[in-house]
Amino acid sequence: DVDFSELDGIILPGGMPGTLNLGAHAGVTAQVKAFAEAGKLVCAICAAPSVLGACGILNGKKATCHPGFEEKLTGASVSYDNVVTDGNVITSRGMGTVIDFGLAIVSYFGSEELVEDVRKHLVYNR
């Protein structure tokens, strides 16, 4: 068992059929909603931002997703940026954007100095 109250954020990994399974699981969607309502970090990549849309978490927020899932970002202002951070929600487009997605999560919790240190150790020069 997991004590979700001890966690600072939640990440939905995307992919298919994983995204469909996440969205259909009442326990997952309940936790995602609870994290959002508590102001905790909610992240999703690839097709998984569609789950956030279905949960009502993207209302009034800017978000991105894998090409072809834009219509599932219910309530969001759709962006085609690789990574979008809007308040406590971070979304990203897919596997090719995963390093930037990870660095956005590090940035949310840490300093820019920490982000640069992680970037350096990843040998990621972007």
Tell where the protein language model's regions lie, with residue ranges:
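Active-site-adjacent pocket-lining segments in enzyme domains
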Residues: 2-126
